[in-house]
Amino acid sequence: MNENDAYLFDVELPTSWTFPVGKTWIAGWFISKTGAQFRDLRLRIDDRIFAGIFGQPRPDIELRYRGYAGLPHAGFCFQVEPHRGAKLLRLEILDHGNNWAELWRQPIKAPRGIRRRQPVL
């Protein structure tokens, strides 16, 4: 679990940051400690952006850390397929002022067996 004065969160999956060939899931939860509303989460692998699902019910986490289960729900997940040679994963959050801020970063390894090139954006 990661925590600061404003929020706490955890990335529960995957348990290893060496990715298999193909698609994989990244999942966890995020809770504001101040009552601030956050609008979205996104994930970056190097310069590629992945949209995910933010706001999945996690009553176990919501009850434990917030004292009630319900909106805003804490869970999130992303399905990603890291490109060959991918090195860095970053989780970013969108605040109510429409500003993206880095929440967390993790070095990663993508196997050499992935033949697709990183798409040009």
Which residues fall in each region the model found?
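Basic, ligand-binding patches in group-transfer machinery
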Residues: 1-121
